[in-house]
Protein backbone atom coordinates (compact mmCIF):
# COMPACT_ATOMS: atom_id res chain seq x y z
CA UNK A 1 0.00 0.00 0.00
CA UNK A 2 1.62 3.28 -1.04
CA UNK A 3 2.04 6.10 1.45
CA UNK A 4 3.84 9.42 1.76
CA UNK A 5 7.06 9.58 3.73
CA UNK A 6 6.60 13.28 4.50
CA UNK A 7 10.35 13.79 4.97
CA UNK A 8 10.46 11.93 8.29
CA UNK A 9 11.58 8.65 9.77
CA UNK A 10 8.90 6.04 10.36
CA UNK A 11 8.62 6.75 14.10
CA UNK A 12 8.42 10.52 13.55
CA UNK A 13 5.84 10.03 10.81
CA UNK A 14 3.68 7.78 12.99
CA UNK A 15 3.86 10.25 15.89
CA UNK A 16 2.90 13.16 13.64
CA UNK A 17 -0.07 11.25 12.18
CA UNK A 18 -1.23 10.27 15.68
CA UNK A 19 -1.03 13.89 16.84
CA UNK A 20 -2.85 15.31 13.83
CA UNK A 21 -5.54 12.60 13.95
CA UNK A 22 -6.14 13.21 17.65
CA UNK A 23 -6.31 16.97 17.11
CA UNK A 24 -8.82 16.51 14.29
CA UNK A 25 -11.04 14.27 16.45
CA UNK A 26 -10.93 16.77 19.34
CA UNK A 27 -11.35 20.03 17.41
CA UNK A 28 -13.23 18.95 14.30
CA UNK A 29 -10.89 20.84 11.96
CA UNK A 30 -7.16 21.43 11.54
CA UNK A 31 -4.99 23.47 9.18
CA UNK A 32 -2.02 21.64 7.67
CA UNK A 33 -0.29 21.00 4.36
CA UNK A 34 -2.04 19.13 1.59
CA UNK A 35 0.23 16.06 1.72
CA UNK A 36 -0.19 15.70 5.48
CA UNK A 37 -3.95 16.17 5.22
CA UNK A 38 -4.27 13.37 2.67
CA UNK A 39 -2.43 10.99 5.02
CA UNK A 40 -4.34 12.10 8.12
CA UNK A 41 -7.61 11.58 6.24
CA UNK A 42 -6.77 7.86 5.93
CA UNK A 43 -6.03 7.39 9.63
CA UNK A 44 -9.02 9.46 10.73
CA UNK A 45 -11.39 7.41 8.57
CA UNK A 46 -10.00 4.23 10.13
CA UNK A 47 -10.46 5.59 13.67
CA UNK A 48 -14.06 6.69 13.01
CA UNK A 49 -14.82 3.27 11.51
CA UNK A 50 -13.46 1.68 14.70
CA UNK A 51 -15.62 4.07 16.71
CA UNK A 52 -18.70 2.99 14.78
CA UNK A 53 -17.94 -0.67 15.52
CA UNK A 54 -17.78 0.15 19.21
CA UNK A 55 -16.82 -3.28 20.56
CA UNK A 56 -13.98 -3.94 23.01
CA UNK A 57 -11.46 -4.90 20.34
CA UNK A 58 -12.22 -1.70 18.40
CA UNK A 59 -11.76 0.37 21.57
CA UNK A 60 -8.39 -1.24 22.21
CA UNK A 61 -7.22 -0.70 18.63
CA UNK A 62 -8.28 2.95 18.74
CA UNK A 63 -6.68 3.43 22.17
CA UNK A 64 -3.40 2.14 20.76
CA UNK A 65 -3.41 4.89 18.12
CA UNK A 66 -5.24 7.94 19.53
CA UNK A 67 -3.27 10.05 22.01
CA UNK A 68 -4.49 10.20 25.60
CA UNK A 69 -5.43 13.90 25.60
CA UNK A 70 -8.20 15.84 27.31
CA UNK A 71 -10.92 16.72 24.81
CA UNK A 72 -13.51 18.48 26.99
CA UNK A 73 -13.90 19.54 30.60
CA UNK A 74 -17.54 19.75 31.66
CA UNK A 75 -18.26 21.55 34.94
CA UNK A 76 -21.64 20.96 36.56
CA UNK A 77 -21.60 22.71 39.90
CA UNK A 78 -19.12 20.81 42.04
CA UNK A 79 -18.85 17.93 39.58
CA UNK A 80 -16.11 18.11 36.97
CA UNK A 81 -16.20 15.58 34.15
CA UNK A 82 -13.14 15.19 31.94
CA UNK A 83 -13.66 13.65 28.50
CA UNK A 84 -10.64 12.13 26.74
CA UNK A 85 -10.10 12.06 22.99
CA UNK A 86 -10.94 8.35 22.92
CA UNK A 87 -14.22 8.91 24.78
CA UNK A 88 -15.09 11.74 22.41
CA UNK A 89 -14.42 9.46 19.44
CA UNK A 90 -16.77 6.73 20.67
CA UNK A 91 -19.43 8.93 22.33
CA UNK A 92 -19.67 12.01 20.08
CA UNK A 93 -17.88 11.63 16.74
CA UNK A 94 -18.76 8.06 15.71
CA UNK A 95 -22.55 8.37 16.30
CA UNK A 96 -22.61 11.44 14.01
CA UNK A 97 -21.50 9.21 11.13
CA UNK A 98 -23.67 6.16 11.87
CA UNK A 99 -25.46 6.39 8.51
CA UNK A 100 -22.38 7.32 6.45
CA UNK A 101 -20.09 4.69 4.92
CA UNK A 102 -16.70 6.36 4.67
CA UNK A 103 -15.81 9.84 3.50
CA UNK A 104 -15.91 11.37 6.97
CA UNK A 105 -13.52 14.23 6.18
CA UNK A 106 -13.32 17.14 3.75
CA UNK A 107 -10.24 18.96 2.43
CA UNK A 108 -10.60 22.66 1.60
CA UNK A 109 -7.66 24.39 -0.07
CA UNK A 110 -6.57 27.74 1.33
CA UNK A 111 -3.56 30.00 0.74
CA UNK A 112 0.03 28.98 0.17
CA UNK A 113 2.39 29.21 3.12
CA UNK A 114 4.55 32.31 2.94
CA UNK A 115 7.90 30.71 3.80
CA UNK A 116 8.02 27.84 1.33
CA UNK A 117 4.84 28.23 -0.76
CA UNK A 118 3.46 24.90 0.47
CA UNK A 119 -0.26 24.49 -0.24
CA UNK A 120 -2.17 24.80 3.04
CA UNK A 121 -5.54 23.14 3.49
CA UNK A 122 -8.25 22.88 6.12
CA UNK A 123 -9.08 19.29 6.99
CA UNK A 124 -12.45 19.04 8.71
CA UNK A 125 -15.01 16.46 9.69
CA UNK A 126 -18.08 16.46 7.46
CA UNK A 127 -21.26 17.60 9.22
UniProtKB/Swiss-Prot annotation:
One of its GO terms (molecular function) is structural constituent of ribosome. The keyword GTP-binding does not apply. Pfam families: Ribosomal_L17. One of its GO terms (biological process) is translation. Belongs to the bacterial ribosomal protein bL17 family. HAMAP family: Ribosomal_bL17. This is Large ribosomal subunit protein bL17. One of its GO terms (cellular component) is cytosolic large ribosomal subunit. InterPro entries: Ribosomal_bL17, Ribosomal_bL17_CS, Ribosomal_bL17_sf. Keywords: Ribonucleoprotein, Ribosomal protein. Part of the 50S ribosomal subunit. Contacts protein L32.
Amino acid sequence: MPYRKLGRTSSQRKAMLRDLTTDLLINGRITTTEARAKEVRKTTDKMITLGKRGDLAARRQAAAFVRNEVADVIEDGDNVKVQSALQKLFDDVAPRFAERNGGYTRILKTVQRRGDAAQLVILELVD
